[in-house]
Amino acid sequence: SDGVQSSALPTRGRPEGAPVADFMPEYDKKVKSGPTWDFAENHEPMGILFGIFLTDDMWVKFVDSSNAYGRKFDSGNGRTFVDITFQEMIRFFGIVMFLGFKSVPQRRELWEVGNSMYTPIIAESMSCRRFETILRNLHWEDYTEVPPDVQRARSKVNSLWKVNGFVEYLSNKCDAAWNLHSMADIDEGGIPCKCFHSAQQYNNSKPVPRFFKIFSLNDSKYYFPKRFHAYAGKGSTTPGDNIDDDGDDNEEENDDDDVPAAYIHVEKLTDRLDLWFINLLMALDNWFNGTRVIKMLRARGIHVVGTFITNRVALSRSEEEPAYYPDFPVWYTKSGPTKGVRGDMRSFQLDEELYVTSWFDKKPVNMMHSYPTCKTTVERNAKDDDGKHIKATFERPTVVRDYVKALRGTDVDDQYTSYYRTSVATKRWPHKFYFHFVTKMFVCAFICHKYIHRLQKHHKEASLYGFSKPLVEYMCRFVYDTDSDSDPEDPVDTRTSVAPLAKGHKDAKVSNNDMRFQPKSEGHDCYHDAKAAPLMCRSRNCSKRTRNRCAACGVPLCIDLRNNTTCFYEYHSRGHYAELQ
């Protein structure tokens, strides 16, 4: 339960027992949250992904830069580079994304006929040698005419200059495609990568210790990444700064050398006018939160709530102010005389719009926020005097509830992106950015698709796998008509629409026979859906239940190599079907 109590915390500067509505920031909803485009014109998965996020100009940029690099550096020694086409680039990324669903020991096994890992959809898309050629020459930034000394100078200013344009391009796409809800959060994500690079971070407490750090502003309700940029390491410029041909930063240098590291990234992510003065609630963790960050965000009309480290707030960064705030509160600690009892809380007002709250749960929780807090109750697991587990009710500040609700957007978005991260191994660090952010665009399109169609959590279409798999297969078979008068870069979808999964046992002859008797090259592959409930096999003479599906027909069909079960073959065989009529 989470009921608000009538009595307020003893916070300086406000009346006792004031209602919550008087102090919670009221969100000024100037525009509707969610996707910004007209749903009636663009609401299908294909249109959302390729019309909003992965647009044609992105693929053209990849093709032009990769061809420029390949012509200069991938020719010679008896090898001739053949220009990469628009179709090949999309098919290449389709194979890369497909390897997020299927992991193999060595990717060449996908092309080896007779190998258990052989995958027709990949083998028919392009040859293994052509895939390796594109992988070897893949580039976003064309720096073939940039002298090596200028490249080294650029790397000293920003070590990620080769991919910053790509990251900024997709960040602008996401920014233009989504309006935030009333709550947002700023947190750090990561791109797993083990390489020799100055921007690579190491944190042994993370699931993947070595990674590139990404700072992101996410919607807390729908987990959509509104804005993001990559961290290039200490002393590097932030993305968006102007760097001339000599590698010099043209932006005016900040004279204040005492600016916190987190301050720069929060300032950069919130520098859009559409986020200002709408009482947006921003959640920050203790690495970002601080007095200077809160004052900067309040000057932009953004409310803040977050945890913080207690030894930061006491220190003053100005000679005019005292070293410590007067009547500074005593924080709860894990042990000693200041250890609290579960449910104890204190709140204190440091400035006009700067409050701190200390609450003791199993351990002390210290919050810094820009609006007053009140008192609520929350249920927690506890033990009674006999040692039995019970549900106990404790008091809790409302800012803790707000913080828990708001600080989850970036973490959930990172979790979505990690589900089907590609298994393509490469020694080149820019490729990690390319593959990671293309995967993230699939997640963004999936979030928009769920929002437009109002899909609930357990709806069968509200699955990232079910949303992404047909799109990836379409990319692997992508073709364009060069004989027509239309733009050769306009995609032509030759993939037959996927039929919905059958509910229960149905006769085989009621299925879509035009799709059913297509050759196997059209995508009639058997896959195992471990998360789906077992359904009755659609073969006429079989009554077993199975989790195996046909990728094109979408119907359950059992297949067992040990017992020589032929339901999958019989269902797709026109001759066998005719014998049964």
Residue ranges: model-predicted function:
Residues 1-581:
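Acidic, contiguous segments within the catalytic cores of piggyBac-derived transposases
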